[in-house]
């Protein structure tokens, strides 16, 4: 253990580090929105994340139809994920997500903010006692380019967020490269 670099320690992250552990997909159950006010979900920890995307049919290399540009992040823990995070005391999932999008992406929430209409799904992790709310925010391709640029100036850029990426949504000639390869990349 190195006290100079922080390697192999948790520091102030110790209380929530288990939320970042990869678990089996059988650990998650989908929760209907109307059940979120009931136990065990209501008293569970909460997290909100968002897929920011733009429809895009401009061919890549003149061959592959990308269908959409979807932003993801390289997180501080080495995993790829969507922007978002834990819901703090006194916040609801939408307020927390807009805060996280501002911190992590420098998103101008006066132009683009997550609302109830952005809601997609909630899953509950049995082992973590964590509700995971997922939202989708559609923007134009030009707006997505601006969001990518602004992300470099985000408060959390370089610490909590190490960069943004777009996932490829096409499959190349060998039937493997492109989206299938992306899906096999360990997160």
Curated annotation (Swiss-Prot):
Keywords (alphabetical) are: Cytoplasm, Hydrolase, Magnesium, Manganese, Metal-binding, Nucleotide metabolism, Nucleotide-binding, Nucleus, RNA-binding
Residue numbers binding Mn(2+) 2: 100
- SUPFAM superfamilies according to UniProt: Nudix
- The regions listed as transmembrane in this protein's record are none
What compartments host this protein? Nucleus; Nucleus, Nucleolus; Nucleus, Nucleoplasm; Cytoplasm
Q: How is the cofactor bound?
A: Decapping activity is higher in the presence of manganese than in Magnesium or cobalt.
Residues in domain Nudix hydrolase?
A: 43-187
Annotated Gene Ontology cellular component terms = cytoplasm; nucleolus; nucleoplasm
Question: What is this protein's function?
Answer: RNA-binding and decapping enzyme that catalyzes the cleavage of the cap structure of snoRNAs in a metal-dependent manner. Has diphosphatase activity and removes m7G caps from U8 snoRNA. May catalyze the cleavage of the cap structure on mRNAs. May also act as a phosphatase; hydrolyzes the non-canonical purine nucleotides inosine diphosphate (IDP) and deoxyinosine diphosphate (dITP). May bind to the U8 snoRNA.
Q: What's the protein here called?
A: U8 snoRNA-decapping enzyme
Gene behind this protein: NUDT16
